[in-house]
C-alpha cells in the first residue's frame, strides 16, 4: 500500500502564505505536466493576497471567487477547507450551520457543495453516549442535489472516518 502511495501522482505544496496567483500557476503547471484530478486548499483562511486590503472578509470573499474560477479554468473539482466562526459555541444546538463559515458569506454563495463535520461526543457535557465514536457529515448545501446528514464512524487514532457498520440481521 505504501508503494502505491509513493507512486501516486499526488503533489503537496505546503509553502506558507501562498497567493492566489501562485496557486493558479502551480495548478496550470501540474495539469500540463502530469494531469490534474483534484485541488485541495487546506485551509482557506491561511491564504494571503500579499497586498493591503480593506477587510479580511473582502479578502476571503475574493479568494472564494478566484478559487471557483480556477476550478472552472482547469476543469477539476476543488475542495477548500475552511474554519467556522464561534457561532455554534453560543447556541444550545452545537451543530454547525452554513452561516458559521468564517470570514465570508461568499463562501456559501460560491460553493457548489458545503459539507460540515460534526462530532456530537466532542461537545462538553455530551450526553449522547449512543453516538460515541460517530460523527456526522452535514451536507448543508448541494447545488442540484439533496441536502441532509450522513452518520459516519470516527476512527481518530488513524486520523480517518469510515462508513458505519450496518446491521445485516434486522
Regions found by a protein language model. Name each.
Residues 1-55, 62, 89-90:
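Conserved inter-motif catalytic segment of the P-loop NTP-binding fold
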Residues 20-38, 65-75, 86-170:
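C-terminal regions of RecA-like/P-loop NTPase motor modules
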Residues 81-83:
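Conserved H-loop
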